[in-house]
Amino acid sequence: MTTVLDPIRHRTILDDIDHICQTAGISQYFLANSMMDVCGPEEVEWVRHFPKNRAVSAGLVLTDGSNVSNRMMYMAGALIRNFTDARVFPINTVLRLAKTGELPTPTVMLIPNLYVKAGGSAKGLAHWDVQAIYDVLLERQAASKPTVLFIEDMDAVSQAYGNVFRDFLENNYKIVG
């Protein structure tokens, strides 16, 4: 693959690429390469039209688990190339940082494992952690800072996190398979 980073347009990114990638939670590979061959058309459209999409929804919920963490890293790379602060955080990191008041507030936060079935069960986070992540999502929505989430099964997330949580997602996020 040929890099999509332009040496002139992306000079500020290239000058600080190690720090930018470390902060974003992605490798340089995802920053330097296009998302086009890996991400689905709805994911590409969401990134391409980010300013418009940011104004009309709280973010994106991905339900197709195929290569989801890499897809999110490609999305973050594309957003960063367009000078948007995008960061990938596992759910446990989000919870740990939120509990200590140290959770960064990037323009776009991507969580590749908000809900993953554990051994086929519908058990998820402890109820206090569900409330903590719900708080994070509400605060990000109020600040117009979209969040991209992976949820393996919307029915199971309803059982594990409650109907109010699912209702919030369905009414405020674009859900794509």
Predicted regions located by residue number:
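A short, basic N-terminal segment
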Residues: 1-53
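Glycine-rich P-loop/Walker A and Walker A-like loops and their local beta1-loop-alpha1 context
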Residues: 36-79
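Loop/turn-to-beta-strand initiation segments
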Residues: 57-58, 84-85, 105-109, 142-150
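Structural motif
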Residues: 61-67, 90-93, 112-115, 151-154
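AAA+/P-loop NTPase substrate/partner-engagement loops
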Residues: 78-118
